[in-house]
């Protein structure tokens, strides 16, 4: 299981832990990933995704999974999220 957010593309970063004496040692900054179930209003279906806490706040801010995916760039999304986005767009096109 990779440590990459499926919606925002956040991945581990590297840097230094710096002590009070300014000694530096290498470390990894891992994203705060959570396994969540998000519901699509258009499809009436739930999806299990592994997303960061920041992405979850953004989903809430934009008004749900459908609105988030409509605004999201395809290159930031995982393959699974891109498939969900395509399903939602197809369902909205047939409903309109």
Curated annotation (Swiss-Prot):
Gene Ontology MF: a single term: structural constituent of ribosome
Ribonucleoprotein is among the record's keywords: yes
Gene Ontology BP, a term: translation
Gene3D superfamilies to which the protein is assigned, alphabetical: Ribosomal protein L28/L24
UniProt xrefs under Pfam families: Ribosomal_L28
Organism of derivation: Cereibacter sphaeroides (strain ATCC 17023 / DSM 158 / JCM 6121 / CCUG 31486 / LMG 2827 / NBRC 12203 / NCIMB 8253 / ATH 2.4.1.) (Rhodobacter sphaeroides)
Source taxon at top rank: Bacteria
Family: Belongs to the bacterial ribosomal protein bL28 family.
Keywords, comma-separated and alphabetical: Ribonucleoprotein, Ribosomal protein
PANTHER family documented for this protein: 39S RIBOSOMAL PROTEIN L28, MITOCHONDRIAL (PTHR13528), LARGE RIBOSOMAL SUBUNIT PROTEIN BL28M (PTHR13528:SF2)
Name of this protein: Large ribosomal subunit protein bL28
Disulfide bonding pattern of the chain: none
Gene Ontology CC terms, in alphabetical order: cytosolic large ribosomal subunit
Region described as Disordered: 1-23
């Amino acid at each position: 299981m990779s440590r990459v957010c499926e919606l925002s593309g956040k991945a581990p970063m590297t840097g230094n832990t710096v002590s009070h004496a300014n000694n530096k040692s290498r470390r990894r900054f891992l994203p705060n990933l959570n396994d969540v179930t998000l519901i699509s209003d258009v499809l009436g279906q739930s999806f299990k995704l592994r997303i960061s806490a920041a992405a979850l706040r953004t989903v809430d801010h934009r008004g749900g999974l459908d609105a988030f995916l409509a605004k999201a760039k395809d290159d930031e999304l995982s393959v699974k999220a891109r498939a969900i986005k395509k399903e939602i767009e197809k369902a909205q096109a047939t409903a309109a």
